[in-house]
Amino acid sequence: MKQGIHPNYVEITATCSCGNVIKTHSTVGKDLNLDVCGNCHPFYTGKQRVVDTGGRVERFNKRFSIPSTK
């Protein structure tokens, strides 16, 4: 490797809004503040909500369905 052309790779601290502190390495060189992490993200905590689109699907099918003739 060439000397003097690579960025400094230093240890930084990433702090989440929930209080979780993660130590990692980066070339950024300054500490990070995170909005969500693995401890508080809804997908990982099991608090994820499923958006109900049933009414919209029914309305679409009603609007664009072929009328049945009996």
From Swiss-Prot:
Regions crossing the membrane: none
Molecular function terms, GO-annotated: metal ion binding; rRNA binding; structural constituent of ribosome
Keyword list, A-Z: Metal-binding, Ribonucleoprotein, Ribosomal protein, RNA-binding, rRNA-binding, Zinc
Cofactors demanded by this protein: Zn(2+)
Coiled coil: none
InterPro entries, sorted: Ribosomal_bL28/bL31-like_sf, Ribosomal_bL31, Ribosomal_bL31_A, Ribosomal_bL31_sf
PROSITE patterns registered for this protein in UniProt: RIBOSOMAL_L31
Protein name, entry field: Large ribosomal subunit protein bL31
